[in-house]
């Protein structure tokens, strides 16, 4: 069963996987493994072969690091997106940027979805998405500026303050996007773990993820190998898969629509198992006790 998202066909009866392809030499997880054109193309081919529904292409490391100006970000993203669109004409392509100028050129090159992971830091982003007919991810950063780390972040005196703030901010941003002309069914919301949040905030958001789902806006979650997973389990960057997948299973069971991931195959298996437990997906084969 298929539906349309940002003008592209996607599965309607299961969660979607957004595979990460970083065009950066210093990304927090892969440390530049897909920075070269050849490596990035190979990663995209692999992700599609493994069942990714969306490819998310970023040109600037999320955290602090070497400065990247607009022209450099454009050079990293636009030619690759042009190639990706020519290679996969029906694939949903996402661009991860907080700069409206970059988003404009990326969408002109073939991107369908703007993953504005720094929560509207550029106020022109809604207008660009509307003008170009692109989808938009409305993210929550608690007011943090792009490429900064959280420091003594507070969301009030109640334990669920961050939950209320996330729901209030992302739903308001989604409504502003629609008012600007972005198609309602092309808007997603993202609580944006680790951005303007500490580990306790990340865990609370997962504990109450059903409340975000109940807003009616499709929810995107980027949990993959995040610091809140590492701090919760006391493990390093290369040992966060199990924690990521546990968080993914919980969020999937609550109804999260899309997951932004590094590991496509492992995530797909988790999502399929959750769906089978919930009764929305039949087992692949049933022999035990029947033959």
UniProtKB/Swiss-Prot annotation:
Gene Ontology cellular-component terms listed: cytosol
Site (Characteristic for family members without dihydropteroate synthase activity): 193
Oligomer status and interactors: Homodimer.
Top-rank lineage group of the source organism: Bacteria
InterPro entries found in the cross-reference section: DHP_synth-like, DHP_synth_dom, Dihydropteroate_synth-like_sf, Pterin-binding_dom
Similarity comment: family membership: Belongs to the DHPS family.
Function: Has very low affinity for the DHPS substrate 6-hydroxymethyl-7,8-dihydropterin-pyrophosphate, but can bind the inhibitor dapsone. Seems to lack dihydropteroate synthase activity, and does probably not function in folate metabolism.
Residue ranges constituting the Pterin-binding domain according to the UniProt record: 15-272
GO molecular function: dihydropteroate synthase activity
GO biological process: folic acid-containing compound biosynthetic process
Protein name: Inactive dihydropteroate synthase 2
Lineage: Bacteria, Bacillati, Actinomycetota, Actinomycetes, Mycobacteriales
